[in-house]
A protein has these predicted regions:
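Conserved RNase H-like, two-metal-ion catalytic cores of nucleic-acid enzymes
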Residues: 11-111, 115
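Metal-dependent phosphoesterase core characteristic of DEDDh/y 3'-5' exonuclease domains
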Residues: 13-18, 73-100, 116-211
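Short hydrophobic targeting helices and cationic amphipathic motifs
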Residues: 4-6
Length: 211
């Protein structure tokens, strides 16, 4: 696992690994087609993306990427994992996925945090989690009128005040312009990639074909 390689083998960071909740989210545009957005929402999306789009690409053509913004996307799955009995021979890694209706999966994920990962020593971990997964979940909770669990209530905190772990941040070594995908990082470190079955860019098309 990438996290263990970076923290335990490479950087010798001392952590109680049973206190870490690993997570990854999958997101898609809130509505399948740009043309089905309200007129106001179409204008807002055009304004939101005007600096990301090339001049010859319209907002409608760019809409397939709408899932990366919490204001225009929804979460369709939150997958989590955690270690049990890490320090002995009975060590295991348990995995659970919350999927389906977004409101329900957000509530279920919140209950997991509040009931099992609510202490100061508990940490969240993701790849690019601090800039994507953690704030995305928080924003979607607010949009859906779900009060934030303490672990995601990061309002007003500076980056260095957020205790959660980000494997991409570990790899940056202070170079904040550097982006490395999870697939690339696992490849160069010789770790089996968890992202081989489907790429992030294909999630929306697969989701809407099946739903």
């Amino acid at each position: 696992m990438l996290f263990l390689y970076l923290t335990k083998k490479a950087m010798n960071i001392k952590l109680d690994f049973e206190n870490v909740l690993f997570l990854d989210i999958e997101t898609v545009p809130e509505i399948e087609n740009f043309s089905n957005l309200t007129a106001d929402k179409q204008v807002l999306f055009e304004e939101k993306t005007k600096y990301q789009r090339k001049e010859d690409i319209t907002a409608e053509e760019f809409y397939e990427r709408a899932g990366i913004w919490a204001e225009f996307g929804i979460i369709i799955c939150i997958s989590v994992g955690y270690f049990v009995n890490f320090k002995n021979s009975q060590r295991s890694f348990r995995v659970k996925s919350f999927y389906g209706d977004e409101v329900q999966l957000l509530k279920d994920f919140k209950n997991l945090l509040n009931n099992h990962f609510n202490k100061a020593e508990h940490l969240l971990c993701g790849h690019n989690g601090k800039e994507f997964d953690f704030p995305y979940i928080a924003r979607r909770m607010i949009i859906n009128q779900i009060s934030l669990p303490e672990k995601l209530n990061l309002f007003g905190k500076k980056p260095w005040e957020i205790p959660h772990i980000d494997t991409m941040e570990l790899w940056k070594f202070g170079d904040y312009k550097h982006f490395t995908s999870l697939k690339l990082l696992t490849s160069i470190l010789g770790i089996p990639s968890p992202k081989d079955d489907i790429s992030g860019s294909d999630v929306a098309s697969v989701y809407y074909k099946e739903n």
